[in-house]
């Protein structure tokens, strides 16, 4: 499940309690809808690990989407974890202060048993 365009791609792997989302490309006003769709498809009670290692651009629209996803997941008993952000993206997270409210880790994602749904 998800969306694909020439500048952005998202893959989702669903496990029993953890959902892995891998984003690749640019997250900006033109592509944030695809990211938002993938994030909102995840049950709020889940731990959502968003791998940002393939993202080179994170605009204000992307930051807003991440903040909203964090609030939605937290309200449902879940958690958003940002994994391996590119150095440019990590800087955006620090400058905006999002790193203070959303956990950011440098670990490689653990494999998730389950199915993988790929954006088209």
Task: Please report, for each region that a protein language model flagged, where it lies by residue.
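STAS-like cytosolic regulatory interaction modules
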Residues: 1-57, 68-120
């Amino acid at each position: 499940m998800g969306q694909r365009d020439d500048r952005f791609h998202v893959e989702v792997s669903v496990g029993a309690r953890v959902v892995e989302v891998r984003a690749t490309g640019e997250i900006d006003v033109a592509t944030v809808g695809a990211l938002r769709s993938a994030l909102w498809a995840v049950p709020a009670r889940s731990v959502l690990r968003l791998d940002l290692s393939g993202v080179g651009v994170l605009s204000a629209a992307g930051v807003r989407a991440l903040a909203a996803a964090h609030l939605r997941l937290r309200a449902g008993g879940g958690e958003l974890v940002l994994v391996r952000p590119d150095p440019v993206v990590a800087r955006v997270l620090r400058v905006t202060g999002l790193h203070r409210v959303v956990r950011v880790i440098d670990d490689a994602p653990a494999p998730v048993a389950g199915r993988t749904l790929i954006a088209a």
